[in-house]
């Protein structure tokens, strides 16, 4: 497989670091959107993870002339009918007066509020990720991964981002935000989706 520059369709530093670690191991040069200031904000107008991932990958591939990889991921909580789902990143935007200085903190606060009184055995949840790789001429491929776990009563840990402080990994018993980057890559929805994407990569690259 020819070495190539791959553009990760995100400015989220946490995602760039997490995904770039794995992609570099396959001999790929990895850049985030900060290297392409001409690419504007891409609005996620899809109603599924697949739609949003492809929308972002296609827009970035067309704008940069490189193969682009985008993901859309979110948290599905069974007791909340799989909310927040595709709205995970902006879950708290319609709820005023939540505690927290950041959107992540407010999202976590809203999740805990909605799960107030829900017993541990009913707090099952999963992180789900769909990745799309797209060429500048529009060829694309999807890969998916999921990470099953449950939602804690309170946040713990300083690593990660998003809902990591509340998500408990059943294998280790630790919150996702307590895991090292390597541990998280080995278990996480994003890591699983990426490994599946890399399995598909040679055929995708050859076209």
Swiss-Prot record:
Keywords: Hydrolase, Magnesium, Metal-binding, Nucleotide metabolism, Nucleotide-binding. Mg(2+) binds at residues 43, 72. GO terms for biological process: nucleotide metabolic process; purine nucleoside triphosphate catabolic process. CDD domains: HAM1. Pyrophosphatase that catalyzes the hydrolysis of nucleoside triphosphates to their monophosphate derivatives, with a high preference for the non-canonical purine nucleotides XTP (xanthosine triphosphate), dITP (deoxyinosine triphosphate) and ITP. Seems to function as a house-cleaning enzyme that removes non-canonical purine nucleotides from the nucleotide pool, thus preventing their incorporation into DNA/RNA and avoiding chromosomal lesions. This is dITP/XTP pyrophosphatase. HAMAP family: Non_canon_purine_NTPase (MF_01405). It holds the Pfam family Ham1p_like. Substrate binds at residues 10-15, 73, 161-164, 184, 189-190. Its cofactor is Mg(2+). It catalyses: XTP + H2O = XMP + diphosphate + H(+); dITP + H2O = dIMP + diphosphate + H(+); ITP + H2O = IMP + diphosphate + H(+). One of its GO terms (cellular component) is cytosol. The keyword Kinase does not apply. Gene3D superfamilies: 3.90.950.10. GO terms for molecular function: dITP diphosphatase activity; ITP diphosphatase activity; metal ion binding; nucleotide binding; ribonucleoside triphosphate phosphatase activity; XTP diphosphatase activity. Binds 1 Mg(2+) ion per subunit. Its EC number is 3.6.1.66. Homodimer. It is an enzyme of class 3 (hydrolase). Belongs to the HAM1 NTPase family. The active site is at 72 (proton acceptor). Signal peptide: none annotated.
């Amino acid at each position: 497989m020819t070495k190539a520059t791959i553009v990760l369709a995100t400015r989220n530093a946490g995602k760039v670091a997490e995904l770039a670690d794995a992609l570099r191991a396959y001999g790929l040069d990895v850049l985030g959107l900060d290297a392409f200031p001409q690419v504007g904000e891409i609005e996620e107008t899809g109603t599924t993870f697949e739609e949003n991932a492809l929308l972002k990958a296609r827009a970035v591939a067309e704008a940069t002339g490189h193969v682009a990889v985008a993901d859309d991921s979110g948290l599905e909580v069974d007791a909340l009918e799989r909310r927040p789902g595709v709205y995970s990143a902006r879950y708290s935007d319609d709820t005023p007066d939540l505690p927290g200085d950041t959107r992540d903190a407010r999202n976590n606060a809203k999740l805990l509020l909605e799960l107030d009184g829900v017993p541990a055995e009913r707090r099952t949840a999963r992180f789900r990720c769909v990745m799309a790789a797209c060429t500048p001429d529009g060829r694309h491929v999807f890969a998916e991964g999921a990470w099953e776990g449950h939602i804690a009563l309170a946040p713990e840990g300083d690593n990660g981002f998003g809902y990591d402080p509340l998500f408990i990994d059943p294998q280790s018993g630790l919150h996702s935000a307590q895991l090292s980057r390597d541990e998280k890559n080995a278990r996480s929805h994003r890591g699983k989706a990426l490994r599946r994407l890399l399995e598909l990569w040679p055929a995708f690259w050859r076209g």
